[in-house]
C-alpha cells in the first residue's frame, strides 16, 4: 500500500505493538526517527489521538511541498458499476480523447520487466521536464517482483512503435492505485495518458475493486500553480477528492533529530 502502516489505527493495542517492533529496528539500524503516513482521514480524531498518545508528533498543516506524499488523493468509486456506467460518467472531452487514442492506433497493454527500459527512459524525460528525482530501474524491478500479479506495468506505444506513456499500478485490498506515471515529450497529441488511465480503471473493475485511486493531486486548490494540471487531468474522470491526516513522526533520538534536521535545513532540504 502506498501509505502506512497498514493497520486499524483505531486499535491502540496494534499500534503499540508496531511501535515496539519499530524501536527494535531503530536500535538495530541506528535510526533516529520513524515517519508514517497512514491511510486515515484528516477528521479521524480517534486515530490521530491514538498516535499522539503513543508519542507520535503530528505534522498537521505543514506546507504541501514539505511532505513526502500529497495529503489529498483523487479517487474514483467503481463499486458495483459496469464499464459502460463508469465510462459514461467521464467528462465528454476525456471520453473523446480515449476514443481518439484508439482511432490513432495507440497500443496500450500491460507488460513485465521486459519493458522496464522503455519505462525508465520515459521516467527520465518526465523527471527532467517536471523537475523531480526518479527511481532506479532496480527499484522498479523489485516493485514488480514484490507484488507479482498484483502489480502491472502499463505501456502505451504509438503506431510507429515509440514508447509514449507508461505507468506502474498496484492492486491491494479493495483498490487499484496508480503509483508511478511517465510520458514522452513527443506525440502527446495521440492522448496516450487518457487511454492508459482507462485501461488501468478497467483492471480495477475486472478485479471487482471498490476504488480506483489516481493518487496525489498537489496544489489542487491553487489554479495558478504549476502542478494544478495534475488535478485538472484527473478531475476529468469524475471522481472525488479525499484528504488524509498526513505525516506523523516518532523520534527515537532527540539529539540526532535536532542535529540532522538543522543540517538538512541548512542545505535547503525540507522534507523531514
PLM segments and residue spans:
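A short, internal acetyl-CoA/4′-phosphopantetheine-binding micro-motif in the GNAT/acyltransferase core
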Residues: 2-12, 79-81, 181-190, 218
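Flexible, glycine- and charge-enriched loops at secondary-structure boundaries
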Residues: 8-15, 87, 133, 190, ...
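Short, flexible/disordered intra-domain loops and linkers
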Residues: 12-13, 41, 45-46, 219-226
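Aromatic (often tryptophan-rich) hydrophobic motifs at membrane interfaces
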Residues: 17-27, 141-146, 150-253, 258
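A conserved beta-strand-loop-helix scaffold within acyl/acetyltransferase catalytic domains
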Residues: 24, 38-189
Amino acid at each position: 500500500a502506498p501509505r502506512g502502516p497498514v493497520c486499524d489505527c483505531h486499535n491502540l493495542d496494534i499500534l503499540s505493538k508496531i511501535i515496539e517492533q519499530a524501536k527494535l529496528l531503530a536500535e538495530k539500524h541506528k535510526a533516529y526517527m520513524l515517519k508514517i503516513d497512514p491511510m486515515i482521514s484528516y477528521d479521524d480524531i480517534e486515530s490521530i489521538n491514538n498516535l499522539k498518545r503513543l508519542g507520535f508528533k503530528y505534522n498537521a498543516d505543514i506546507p504541501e511541498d514539505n511532505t513526502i506524499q500529497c495529503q489529498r488523493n483523487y479517487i474514483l468509486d467503481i463499486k458495483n458499476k459496469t464499464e459502460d456506467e463508469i465510462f459514461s460518467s467521464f467528462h465528454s472531452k476525456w471520453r473523446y480523447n480515449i476514443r481518439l487514442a484508439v482511432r490513432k492506433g495507440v497500443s496500450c497493454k500491460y507488460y513485465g520487466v521486459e519493458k522496464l527500459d522503455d519505462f525508465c527512459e520515459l521516467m527520465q524525460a518526465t523527471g527532467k521536464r517536471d523537475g523531480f528525482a526518479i527511481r532506479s530501474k532496480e527499484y522498479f524491478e523489485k516493485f514488480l517482483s514484490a507484488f507479482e500479479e498484483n502489480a502491472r506495468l502499463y505501456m502505451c506505444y504509438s503506431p510507429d512503435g515509440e514508447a509514449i506513456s507508461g505507468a506502474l499500478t498496484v492492486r491491494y485490498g479493495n483498490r487499484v492505485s496508480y503509483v508511478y506515471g511517465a510520458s514522452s515529450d513527443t506525440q502527446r497529441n495521440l492522448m496516450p495518458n487518457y487511454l492508459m488511465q482507462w485501461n488501468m480503471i478497467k483492471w480495477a473493475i475486472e478485479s471487482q475493486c471498490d476504488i480506483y485511486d489516481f493518487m496525489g493531486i498537489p496544489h489542487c486548490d491553487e489554479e495558478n500553480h504549476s502542478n494544478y494540471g495534475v488535478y485538472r487531468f484527473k478531475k476529468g474522470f469524475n471522481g472525488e477528492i479525499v484528504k488524509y491526516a498526513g505525516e506523523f513522526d516518532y523520534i527515537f533520538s532527540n539529539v540526532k533529530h535536532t542535529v540532522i534536521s538543522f543540517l538538512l535545513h541548512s542545505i535547503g532540504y525540507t522534507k523531514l
